[in-house]
Amino acid sequence: MSQSILTNSLVSPYQPHSAAVSTEKRKSASVKHPMHSLCALAVASVLSTAPAFAQDGQANADAEAQKGKLERIEVTARKTVESLQETPVAITSIGAVELGEKGISVLTEVQQFSPNTTLQTSRGTNSTLTAFIRGLGQQDPLWGYEPGVGIYVDDVYIARPQGAVLDLLDVQRIEVLRGPQGTLYGKNTIGGAVKYVTKEMTGDTQMNVEATVGSYSQRDIKVTGQIPLIEDTVYLGVGYANLNRDGFGEYLVSALPNQDKENYNKDLWAARVTLEVHPSEDLFFRIGWDKTEDTSNAKGGYRLIPSILTDAPVPDSVFDSYTSLPTWNKVELEGYNWLARYRVNDDLELKYIGSHRESYSPTNIDFDNTPLPIFDVPAEYDDNNDTHEIQANYTGNAFSLVSGLYFYDGESCGNFDAILGVLGQSLGASGLTREVTGCNNSESWAAYAQMNYDVTDKLSLSLGARYTDEEKTAFVNNGLVFANVYPYTDWIDGYVRPDGQLVPQVLGTDTDGDEVLDAPAVESWSRFTPRVGVEYQMDRDTMFFASYSQGFKSGTFNPRAQTNEPGVEPEVVDSFEVGVKSDLTDALRMNITLFSYDHKDRQYIGVEGDLSDPTALDQRLRNAAETAAKGAELEMTWVATDNLQFDVAYGYIDFEIKKNNAIPPLIGLASTPENTFNLNANYLLETSFGDITFNANYYYRDDYLIFETSDLIQQDAYGMVNLSARWESVEGDWYAGLHVKNLTDEEYLVGGYDFVTQDDDGNFGPGLGGDTTLIGYYGDPRTVHLTVGYRF
């Protein structure tokens, strides 16, 4: 199959299949020899070529024999191809056909099908990802803060959350790995990892054209294809996608003239070119380029309580807002990727994976969401990184080994202007801005190995370790300017930014022996992260496993530093798991995992001082807390008949605070419900004019906090219903899908801001900027969309 390309929205072209293929059979999709099942892909904007055409007669016969039975699902969680049921890791795997049947159109919807998982769009953005698994992640996307959940595209690490809310094309499967992945995947995977596994190009010239129309004037066009330049040897893949949708709401009032008033809209294009070379059966090369540009408007929040500085009422719709900033926003992503793979013999495979990524994101975030400049934050994010990885994977009869060397070099920089214009005017100035600029740059290398040894035909042991050495350099300029300042000239029409640096450097190194900071701060850390596991295969259908693993989130510097404060140590998670993976019958699968972990040296940004007086505030980053959690996860599949299948996923987590030096104090887990539940039903109707697949899905999330130190914004428990129907022609060339999301039009919070004070009686008072800023951002309302595609 053709290689996939990722954009900042997720679409999965449907794979053609015989009418005889069961849902579970299609979901598993064939995964070839390890040499042919892994391909590296660049980070955000990757489009794919068209999927392969109908299976041959033998495949149809095999599929017919498998109807009504569970099928083998293959995963690469341990960087080698193996059965899901034989992999001692808590994994949710969603195949390309299943993505299409459920109508999954964006990465954040994957959270519905994985227990104890949160994947949401970050606050005032359209494409920045907030990810938590088992309560471990990172909410603030500012440069310098490291994620707690790793995002990978065929083993290429996506370092920053900007642009990570991806749409997919022709992905073979998505794997959600729960629990620390510190041995094979390295830093910043204390919660787990999300993997995109894609296909390589094979076969003849293929094209795929797909169009989607839907609610809020959704109109998407995707054209992808592959051309064999030399038969079975050299392939050229190209793709283009244009994704558009009007806003779910609007900016009711914009203080600036000539602004686009769409709120929660979508406007994105992506393109790619890929060259793949197969010189022999044992040797493979690929080079790719991709680019994405997302010009969806900045997202305006919903005021949960009225402003005390304006007379603007709380809007009727949670998707309506007010702003005093420009409404434009941009995310630009561009990247290159390289892959070389050589199968030395039947037991040994060597691989090199390399990538270079660049991203630039100027954006406007109105924290107070009023027509006045009470608390406005225009900001820029500017990142680039290079990665290199060499792998050597050995597979013997009783012994296997995955090993490698990894190098990462990344620069993460930015600039934001916290404009407190109304407060500045009250002080007799034309305005007031706290400007912060800086960089947090990282260079790290790692060596890792994980071996598995079969002690007997039933008992296996696994032992792994990774050593990581990392150096970070950082500088911060931070200070007050008694005027309203924007990042560059013409940020708003007619604005001219003064020349030079407006605020002093406060974080760095004094190299001249005086009080002037003229070099970046430097810190180095190293971590040894082990894993020990034991697996017992009781019989062909049942495996018990237990493991201890460790992961860490990188140490860093405070990107909002106001003084020359030291860096903070890495966060460390020690996790224990026990579980069972069992096929109880040919039609019933049940996987259960119990886990507990200790989370030490939690990095926490605390705000000290008078919240209403920005000149008195001090934000310090500290290792300020230690927590623990325990929980359970259940995933079950029942193939009730040849054409009917049910899937259940349940997650539970119990949280404990063991040490709490945070200011304000820690009170709970952010964006993590105590209970999550999903029930999915899939029915395949076989007709003379093609297959029709009906899908119904119910998803439940318990109540949860938006912030870990405040209960002012929290979401009550809610349930969501999604319905889909997909038709595919007998020949497999035409397909169409009708999808209804959030059928009951539930309103649910996914982010917010709480710059407000509250007295003992529950009355709200002014916070930073002088207003009662309590803002919520919401998930998508009810939508309906129709997709029609043609392959040739």
Task: Give the label of every model feature segment.
Residues 1-102, 108-114, 226, 281, ...:
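N-terminal Sec signal peptide and the immediately downstream disordered periplasmic leader
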Residues 260, 266-402, 408-409, 589-591:
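Outer-membrane beta-barrel domain signature, strongest for Gram-negative TonB-dependent receptors
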Residues 337-343, 349-365, 537-553, 560, ...:
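Membrane-embedded beta-barrel scaffold of Gram-negative outer-membrane proteins
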